[in-house]
Amino acid sequence: MAIFFLPLVLPGFAPRSEDSFKSPARFSWSYLNPSKLKKRSVGLSTETNAHGQAYFTLEGHKFMIVGGSIHYFRVPREYWKDRLLKLQACGFNTVTTYIPWNLHEQERGKFDFSEILDLEAYVLLAKTLGLWVILRPGPYICAEVDLGGLPSWLLRNPGSNLRTTNKDFIEAVDKYFDHLIPKILPLQYRRGGPVIAVQVENEYGSFRNDKNYMEYIKKALLNRGIVELLLTSDNESGIRIGSVKGALATINVNSFIKDSFVKLHRMQNDKPIMIMEYWTGWYDSWGSKHTEKSANEIRRTIYRFFSYGLSFNVYMFHGGTNFGFINGGYHENGHTNVVTSYDYDAVLSEAGDYTEKYFKLRKLFASGSARPLPPLPRLIPKAVYPSVNLSFYLPLFDILPYLNKPVMLETPVTMENLPINNGSGQPFGLVLYETSICFGGGLSASVHDSAQVFLNDKSIGILDENNEFLHIPKIQGCQLLRILVENQGRINFSWRIQSEQKGLNEAVTINGTLLRNFTIYSLDMKMSFFERLRSASWRIAPKTYKGPAFYWGSLNVGSFPTDTFLHLPNWHYGFVFINGRNLGRYWDIGPQKTLYLPGPWLHPEDNDVIVFEKIEKGFYIQTRKKPQLQN
């Protein structure tokens, strides 16, 4: 296999023409299979030959990383095998995944590696199927998830200085790594596992404000027993300042950018080029257009990677879904949120279906493979089920008895600082603040991200980061002021992560008078809440209703449930829960118009459907065989 790059640097290794690409010996790695390889001593390494050409080796054999990203936490566990088999059948030899700290440790000191978060099971499954694994444990990962994968309880202390060697932050990282890394150790290559490399942090070159931080994180991995190749990952502008001695610097790109590769090569000219992220598409945000990228462009770019002998990872091979409240956000002319679908216009669709990109890449990879690629796994069928009539409802303020006991505070605090969840605050969802007022006037409150304001149960307006003032009309006697605040997704990139507390701060005033004595309810929408809600006295839903409310109906799927997509005509903004599972947010501004409903999350026959709609009741819910990801 001819490895390397750039004829201007290494004469005699010019890129091949497309015709000559079909050399059958070029990509024969059948002897390097994690489920069969018995001798384990060297692991993934970098070497340079007598001509100055650098390349990867695995157990002493030349090796090219052909990777694709699939995040286990965005895919139903029942479909991990399906997605990994499709990765392999396309011609890839490696799967990469981030590890989200905020999902594994939602409450400080309470770790969850079960079900969809069972990292060890995911990695061992990849090994069984014959795939190598690259892990990206952060602690920060970006990945368009809430706070870039950092747990929200870190924001309880405003002086923590995330992603630095600040004492509070590092202590939290150390405790997390003390729990996480022992799970990874037996999965490493030299211990018989499939993990051939581990990434140190993520894109620190775009953030860096602590020269000692990357060295600390690297040592935190090494001191706990990580022995495989270490990597860093940055955009071109950050590859030098985001690097750390002892780790291979890799680059993230949107296309084949020769100058970027030259820059990386000059920085470490005795190392092979590795593209840690080649973006096959992009994420969508609410109110924007759906992003698409040409399949022909993807094929051409990856062909050029091959022709130059560059190792690469496709981000994303399969994007999956931002189930629940896990989506992130970013700041561009105000706060903007990532949609529920993480389809990403990836090689495999959100529901695991083949795309034009998939077939073009499979054909390309097959042309350079010494052995036939595995057969294509069958597609998972999609179904159309009878429409769901949401016949019963509960206005928001009727469900308060079914929530956990409220918190009584003199002045409001952000959701992260609520004294709940063993001192960890509230990570996701909504918060309802209530206090009694006896006069009207100008209400001023700093809100993150959006708030609906009520007098008793009557809506009087909206607050958000661009509108922190609302006039309250003259009132008779005293009334209950209610402010319902939603966390729409914490920013996942840039220095702004330091100040991403959600909810209300202490300064809530009317005509400059500070409001006091708040009752605060947490609406985190956990499974236990929906179990309690089953016993509520649901009412017959009217034809129309304005204001936040829960609606309940039943979806009948027959004896053999399978995947479908939910479409909510005439509904405006809210969340859908199937048998207590949060499918994610819907919003009529688009571009996403359907929600993916995995078949394994359905029961035979009847399934509970609960919709929390914030604005105004719609009519019914339809099911479809295909998604609608653009207006």
Swiss-Prot record:
EC number: 3.2.1.-
Active site: 203 (proton donor), 277 (nucleophile)
Signal peptide: none
Any one cellular-component term (Gene Ontology): vacuole
UniProt feature coiled coil, ranges: none
Protein name, entry field: Beta-galactosidase-1-like protein 3
Keyword list, A-Z: Glycosidase, Hydrolase
GO BP: any one term: galactose catabolic process
Species name: Rattus norvegicus
One example GO MF annotation: beta-galactosidase activity
Alphabetical list of Pfam families matching this protein: BetaGal_ABD_1 (PF21317), BetaGal_gal-bd (PF21467), Glyco_hydro_35 (PF01301)
Taxonomic lineage from the root: Eukaryota, Metazoa, Chordata, Craniata, Vertebrata
Sequence similarity: Belongs to the glycosyl hydrolase 35 family.
Cited InterPro entries: B-gal_1-like (IPR026283), BetaGal1-like_ABD1 (IPR048912), BetaGal_gal-bd (IPR048913), Galactose-bd-like_sf (IPR008979), Gly_Hdrlase_35_cat (IPR031330), Glyco_hydro_35_CS (IPR019801), Glycoside_Hdrlase_35 (IPR001944), Glycoside_hydrolase_SF (IPR017853)
Xref: SUPFAM superfamilies: (Trans)glycosidases (SSF51445), Galactose-binding domain-like (SSF49785)
